[in-house]
Amino acid sequence: MSERKLFTSESVSEGHPDKIADQISDAILDAILAEDPEAHVAAETCVYTGSVHVFGEISTTAYIDINRVVRDTIAEIGYTEAEYGFSAESVGVHPSLVEQSGDIAQGVNEALESREGDTDDLSHIGAGDQGLMFGFAINETPELMPLPISLSHQLVRRLAELRKSGEISYLRPDAKSQVTVEYDEHDKPVRVDTVVISTQHDPEATNDQIRQDVIEKVIKAVIPADYLDDDTKFFINPTGRFVIGGPQGDSGLTGRKIIVDTYGGYSRHGGGAFSGKDATKVDRSASYAARYIAKNLVAAGLATKAEVQLAYAIGVAQPVSVRVDTFGTSTVPEAVLEAAVRQVFDLRPAGIIQMLDLKRPIYKQTAAYGHMGRTDIDLPWERLNKVDALVEAVKTVL
């Protein structure tokens, strides 16, 4: 009997409470970076019925209207009706932002290497905190992402498209998806076993109507027919009713969907969240760099899947460790890949910022539907412009 395995990942829509918080935090970050690219930002958001609290630490020369940024973000998501219990113009906005700690700033603004006499400009910035970050890539999809998270993101994005276009008029902003994929004995995806979709809706919509629309206009529009069969299970709004949703149904916080933001649990995670943080925070920038490395390694044919771990000490520019794990799929020893990675990629915070041009206001667009593997927007860590350099570096190491 051949061994078959199941793996499940989930995603949530832009109207999910935690994702509202992420988008507000990144909208604030973008607004600040648009005026002050050198700003240090750590903006956290909490949302609940009728209220938004924004708090954290910011050092900047910019002035932004946080109240307006918050309301505009909520309106763009689709919370514009009072009956939702959370609407752009009536919600209470409560900002409480202070300046970044001087003790932290001194290590970020002047790294240990710089204090010890290193005159390289890229050694000047130290990591904003200690920590470990992972990046991953696999050849299951054209964007080199695991199939379960890729499909999960596409499903909730499709729901949002149908809601905003008015094609399904009874949809409301909050939604979740979950996809279980069956893999064969060679770890290749062969079919979709289960799809779960819960979508907020107007009270007049019937369960039968929702089920039919979601299966025909969402699931079958997203998941290739080859992956669906008579045994595929669909659970559509399995509680039977989802009228109360968004922050009226659950409170939301920045940084509570870190697995949705990355690889759906298929790869390890260092625990740090992304949204609301400028690029001196390696939780964010080094995670992007690790994805950039892993994706280019797989695209170069050096492995069929790759996980890259980076780790840092606060106030120190150079990473304390770089590890490449290819799970036995690499064409050369992993030590060779690690050496090649160190040759090709400057993994000091300032090196990552320069390499990926991370001082720009590009972050709000990442705050829903995943930071990795995006095909709908142009993100620098998704580019395959280091393939040739990696192949050549491997040759020099060998």
Curated annotation (Swiss-Prot):
Please give a single GO biological process term from the UniProt record.
one-carbon metabolic process
Cite the annotated pathway. Amino-acid biosynthesis; S-adenosyl-L-methionine biosynthesis; S-adenosyl-L-methionine from L-methionine: step 1/1
Stated EC number for the protein is 2.5.1.6
The cofactor named in the record is: Mg(2+); K(+)
Q: What Gene3D superfamilies does the annotation carry?
A: 3.30.300.10
UniProtKB keywords: ATP-binding, Cytoplasm, Magnesium, Metal-binding, Nucleotide-binding, One-carbon metabolism, Potassium, Transferase
Concerning PROSITE patterns, the annotation shows:
ADOMET_SYNTHASE_1, ADOMET_SYNTHASE_2
Residues that bind L-methionine, according to the entry? E57, Q100, D250, K281
Q: Top EC class per UniProt?
A: transferase
A molecular function (GO) term: methionine adenosyltransferase activity
Where, in this chain's numbering, is ATP bound? H16, D174, A175, K176, R241, F242, D250, R256, K257, A273, K277
Q: Which InterPro entries match?
A: ADOMET_SYNTHASE_CS, S-AdoMet_synt_C, S-AdoMet_synt_central, S-AdoMet_synt_N, S-AdoMet_synthetase, S-AdoMet_synthetase_sfam
| Major localization listed first in the record, in broad terms | cytoplasm
The residues that hold Mg(2+) are D18
Please indicate if the UniProt record lists ATP-binding as a keyword: yes
Pfam families assigned to the protein according to its UniProt record, in alphabetical order: S-AdoMet_synt_C (PF02773), S-AdoMet_synt_M (PF02772), S-AdoMet_synt_N (PF00438)
What binding details are noted for the cofactor? Binds 2 divalent ions per subunit. Binds 1 potassium ion per subunit.
UniProt GO cellular component terms: cytoplasm
**Region Flexible loop: which residues?**
100-110
**From the record, what ranges are coiled-coil?**
none
Compartment list: Cytoplasm
List the CDD domains hit by this protein, alphabetically.
Answer: S-AdoMet_synt
Q: What is stated as this protein's family in its record? A: Belongs to the AdoMet synthase family.
Instruction: Note the subunit structure.
Output: Homotetramer; dimer of dimers.
The job of this chain, per UniProt, is described as: Catalyzes the formation of S-adenosylmethionine (AdoMet) from methionine and ATP. The overall synthetic reaction is composed of two sequential steps, AdoMet formation and the subsequent tripolyphosphate hydrolysis which occurs prior to release of AdoMet from the enzyme.
Name of this protein: S-adenosylmethionine synthase
Annotated source species: Streptococcus pyogenes serotype M5 (strain Manfredo)
